[in-house]
């Protein structure tokens, strides 16, 4: 029945979106079905958007911890799902997996653009970046901050809205 399939789908999404209770935390491939991926990607994007929104809406002044570190740890679920799926797509693909990849790729591109071109998020990153000399960051933190700032800049965060829209269209 539909309810039964919905329940099973939620269990499968759970398998992909939660930490794996397996030796070495490896993906339980025998329990993952191709039809589980699209809803899992949708859930992963939803969770990642919520994490980004929490960073953007944080009323506290931007700091390394509440902006750069939080950004570095955001999207873990989506990253895990993507790693599993795209490794399967590369190593053991079939027509169904390729079809899913065609459906998922635009969703991931749109999400990536929404993050990289988010003016409020970039403003927080830029604020921290401009204060980097005063923050007493260690080498690893300095590298992370530099990479995050440059990634936003190189991916269009400094563009005008018209140019950002042109970039999204590509």
Describe these PLM feature segments:
Residues 9-170:
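Zn2+-dependent metallopeptidase catalytic domains
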Residues 1-10:
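N-terminal low-complexity segments that are often proline-rich with Ser/Thr-Pro
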């Amino acid at each position: 029945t539909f309810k039964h399939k919905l329940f099973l789908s939620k269990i499968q999404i759970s398998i992909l979106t939660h930490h794996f209770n397996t030796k070495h935390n490896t993906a339980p491939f025998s329990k993952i079905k191709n039809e589980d991926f699209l809803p899992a990607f949708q859930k992963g994007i939803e969770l990642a958007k919520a994490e980004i929104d929490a960073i953007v809406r944080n009323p506290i002044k931007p700091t390394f911890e509440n902006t750069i570190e939080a950004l570095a740890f955001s999207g873990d679920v989506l990253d895990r799902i993507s790693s599993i799926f795209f490794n399967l797509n590369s190593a053991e693909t079939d027509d169904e997996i390729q079809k899913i990849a065609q459906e998922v790729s635009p969703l991931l591109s749109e999400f990536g653009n929404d993050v990289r071109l988010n003016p409020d998020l970039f403003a927080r990153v830029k604020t921290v970046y401009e204060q980097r000399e005063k923050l007493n960051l260690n080498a690893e933190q300095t590298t992370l901050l530099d990479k995050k700032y440059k990634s936003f800049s190189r991916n269009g965060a400094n563009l005008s809205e018209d140019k950002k829209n042109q970039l999204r269209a590509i």
